């Protein structure tokens, strides 16, 4: 028991990092409590399952949670969310914790069975509102809610591939918010080979070289291929 307690202990400076994160992206006490429960579970699982990079644990709140919460500043009215490749729960579980208070929900798509099990447990323990779909993104479109306000993805796939997954859903309305890093311009240039789009870029509130790519209107370029498929 003592060994398990030691493994689950947060990094020494996590409290300070949490305070910094909540200054960037304030939440209610209720949502904060849900996030605390999620973080505690993540730290327990992290000891035996690599959910996030160990190097980022000291900045878990600013690097991961605030990075996820900032999507709510770009789409404050969104209530039905779809998260591609949810992995360790960023941004999907974080948004689900916020949606519990706002009357919304999040559908989390994850192809790894162990990570999908973690996501289900994270929703249960935290009280976040959502569902987990164990599937590849491209194979699960018929299982998504009929209307999506906002599609998200973080560290899942190149931008042009994400757009391919999102395109049939965006035609029903809504928008996509993809979290990208310092190579965002190169990814946009590559995506423009396959798609006509008018992206809006939002600098990350967490600093560094992160960006949010906002998309709502996209069209396929003619006579191009995406992953070998004729557009």
From Swiss-Prot:
Cited CDD domains: AdoMet_MTases
InterPro entries referenced in this protein's UniProt entry, alphabetically: rRNA_ssu_MeTfrase_G (IPR003682), SAM-dependent_MTases_sf (IPR029063)
MF term (GO), any: rRNA (guanine-N7-)-methyltransferase activity
Reaction(s) catalysed (UniProt annotation): guanosine(527) in 16S rRNA + S-adenosyl-L-methionine = N(7)-methylguanosine(527) in 16S rRNA + S-adenosyl-L-homocysteine
GO CC field: cytosol
Pfam families membership: GidB
Record-linked Gene3D superfamilies: Vaccinia Virus protein VP39 (3.40.50.150)
Subcellular localization, as worded in the UniProt entry: Cytoplasm
UniProt keyword annotations, A-Z: Cytoplasm, Methyltransferase, rRNA processing, S-adenosyl-L-methionine, Transferase
Primary site of residence: cytoplasm
Binding site for S-adenosyl-L-methionine: 85, 90, 154
EC number, UniProt record: 2.1.1.170
Domain of life: Bacteria
Family, per entry: Belongs to the methyltransferase superfamily. RNA methyltransferase RsmG family.
Function: Specifically methylates the N7 position of guanine in position 527 of 16S rRNA.
Xref: NCBIfam families: rsmG_gidB
Protein name: Ribosomal RNA small subunit methyltransferase G
Lineage of producing organism: Bacteria, Pseudomonadati, Pseudomonadota, Alphaproteobacteria, Hyphomicrobiales
Gene giving rise to this polypeptide: rsmG
